Amino acid sequence: MKPGEEIAVSNGVDGKEYRCGIEEFLDGEVRCTLRFIKEDGVELPSHIYLFQGLPKADKMELIVQKCVELGVFEIIPVATKRAVVKLDEKKARSKTERWQGIAEAAAKQSKRGIIPQVTMPVSFAEAVKRASSMDLSLIPYEMAEDGMSLTRELIESARPGMDIAVFIGPEGGFEQEEINLALENDIRPIT
């Protein structure tokens, strides 16, 4: 890089891309001048919150990476009844820090305007409580009765600016008790 070249800068929070011209290099720093702000970056028009059932082994790392690359706004690991993985407080904190690092790297790699947050794991009940306040909450469930027509209708109802919760279960799926709790809180089952 040299003076006169243009660089793209992001604060990782507001989704904007700041285009700057390099002015000079001083004592390990780069002085730039803001040229313009690109408001319509690569972020999705809605915020997608992934409530991910804890998977076996290190599969969560790949899930975090790919979901960040695809545009997910926040990832909430969820301890479900059928989850094989059981994390104590210390392990949960360590894993969350690792997952957050993966989210940051994936956001930079895919030139995201924000760095999605990976929260500490929560119980299924806590996840349902949080998701129930969102504009649209969906839970894929193999026994959903309304089929693909309702699934299409719900997905097509998503609008810019909405907060959308998507639940994904662990390898064994969700217990009927968990599905019932989701239904009681207006989380819609889809196929």
What are these regions (language model features)?
Residues 32, 115-119, 189:
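Generic structural signal for residues in well-ordered beta-strands
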Residues 6, 55, 171-175:
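Gly/Ser/Thr-rich beta-alpha loop segments that engage phosphate groups in nucleotides
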Residues 1-39:
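N-terminal positively charged helical leader segments and presequences
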Residues 7, 33, 42-51, 155-162:
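Mobile, glycine- and charge-enriched loop segments
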Residues 134-173, 177-180, 185-191:
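Active-site/ligand-binding-proximal alpha/beta "capping" segment
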Residues 39-139:
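RNA substrate-binding interface of SAM-dependent RNA methyltransferases
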Residues 2, 73, 188:
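Short acidic/polar active-site loop segments enriched in Thr and Asp
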